[in-house]
Amino acid sequence: MTLSRRQAIGAALAAPVAVKAAAAAASPPALPDKASFAPTLVAYLDSASIHPMSLGARRAMDAYAAGRTLDPAAPPPVDRAATIASFARLVNADPDEVTWVQSTTMGEQAVLRALGFPGTGGRIVTDTLHFYAAFPMYQELAIQGVDVTWVQAHDGRILLEDMARAITPGTRLVSLSLVSTYNGFQHDLKAVCALAHAVGALVYADIIHAAGAVPVDLHDSGVDFAACATYKWLMGDFGLGFLYARRGVLDDLRLADFGYYGFAAPGAAPGIGLSPPQTHVYPMDPPGQAPTSYIHRAGALGHFGTGTYAQAVIPAIDHGLDYIAAIGVPAIQAHAQQMIGALREGLIAKGYRLITPADARTPLLTALLPDARERLAAPLARAQVRLSLHDHHFRIAPSVFTDMRDVERLLGALPRA
């Protein structure tokens, strides 16, 4: 049978939907899973920087592009509310506690604005294993009068007793990374939240290195706010992520973001889709005392919803969340730990000093090395091994596709420390 061009395109674009349905019913892929990703000559051990896009995510984005080019054979768009719900299930949150955000940093900024920083002043506690690119943000807040306290790391850890000493009465916010981008250290988030709440402080957690990589339970932790982008362990892409706000925490906070996704027409049904306010200024509009009538949407969307967002990324995120759910985070974590264990043993044998805590269960492993970038760039390039090189340390981050051959290739390429 010969297919017409339109039939062939339609069949190709329908494939992601069929694959998704089949995947839900079939056995999850075994790990390591190289088949779900494009073939490469590179031993890729840098998923903590950027996770490779899976073939399924690429097909899902291709299907979205077909719709945007008005292809009549394009499948229906991804249900965005269902994608929000999938993320909420992953981190044990309710869907209305979650909304879209451009990036992790934009989520953190939104929380700071909602709390009135810097204008209202007050005390913020953060630590030196938080995301290093957020450091200038807190330094600038300090310049503008906010009392910012830094908890220092010791041997690659932030000690709970040091957090307890820093979180004093009058603290308004504790801001941290659940899993540190520097070395994979993981906070006891529930314990930190208990310390903060005991003095009336709220807690924000950057979960970009936790969601999809280690079990996360936002409700159980008691954390007030959390945010993450999706281009790392959620296997999405740049430009869109999630912002979480615990139910009830927004009730006493002023509205600081005024975007049209946060408002809806009076009487509009619940949902996350666009609901333009009722106008009173155009011909044949109903009369009104103000230019528009609107209601505030409930939950995180009503407080943080702004304008349009990167909709082309949603199909990739949706596919990534389905993939993670099919395998299960515990299985993903266990596979990563198998790779990390072999890497840890091999690095120590070569004389490298590790700064990742020995009991960490995250998929990041960091070693200290003076002039690491200068010394390792050439041998790693020759061996076609990719990891995260910095001035005086390097970070390795295996994922679902990593196998022992990748590990052995890296260890073989590294000179003795």
What do these predicted regions represent?
Residues R6:
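Residues within the helices of the helix-turn-helix
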Residues I9-A417:
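Pyridoxal 5′-phosphate
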Residues M1-L3:
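N-terminal secretory signal peptides
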